[in-house]
Regions:
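N-terminal alpha-helical signal peptides/signal-anchor transmembrane segments
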Residues: 3-28
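Extended amphipathic alpha-helical segments with heptad-repeat/coiled-coil character used for oligomerization
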Residues: 24-57
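Intrinsically disordered, low-complexity regions enriched in Pro/Ser/Thr/Gly and acidic residues
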Residues: 45-166
Length: 166
């Protein structure tokens, strides 16, 4: 149940960030926190909001989420894992990105901890309009590949997910 709820939450956030894509023009090359703006505009499900916290939201699995515009080119959703939910969260994110691949330029997953093991995958997966023979395509990811990619991150690591709209 919680994983399905989490998937609905991320769908709402990611599609909401698409609606806010014009904000990136105002961001310049600065890291801008838009979590508060998305909360105030109704772009975040109410169960993800904790009173007294306006810079972060929480998903159904208890992961803390920061949403920002990191540059002119992409939104960044940083997920601080709450225990051993990271692999399941990663699988949800990649599965959702695969579904949204016609609208995405790229989904980039990476562990944020300096001591995080490197993955066998590039961890950059491209949407339908930007996918080439030499690039990893979101639409071509198999369930087994999604499992292998997410398992390569290990546990208890922060995961940075970059959603790039073009």
């Amino acid at each position: 149940y919680k994983l399905n709820k989490q998937l609905v939450q991320y769908t709402t956030i990611i599609t909401g960030s698409y609606q806010l894509a014009r904000l990136r023009d105002a961001a310049g090359n600065k890291n801008v926190n838009i979590t508060r703006f998305m909360i105030n505009s109704g772009g975040v499900p109410s169960e993800m909001i904790k009173p007294g916290f306006s810079n972060y939201i929480w998903d159904a699995m208890g992961n803390q989420i920061y949403i920002g515009i990191e540059s002119l080119y992409f939104f960044k959703i940083t997920i601080s894992q709450s225990g051993k939910t990271d692999v399941l969260t990663c699988r949800n994110i990649l599965s959702l990105s695969k579904e949204l691949s016609p609208m995405l330029w790229q989904t980039h997953l990476r562990p944020r901890a300096e001591d995080a093991p490197s993955s066998n995958y590039d961890n950059r997966f491209y949407g339908d309009n930007y996918c080439t023979r030499s690039a990893s395509c979101l639409k071509n990811l198999t369930p087994l590949q999604i499992m292998e990619i997410c398992d390569s991150f290990g546990s208890n690591k922060e995961l940075s997910m970059r959603i790039l709209w073009k």
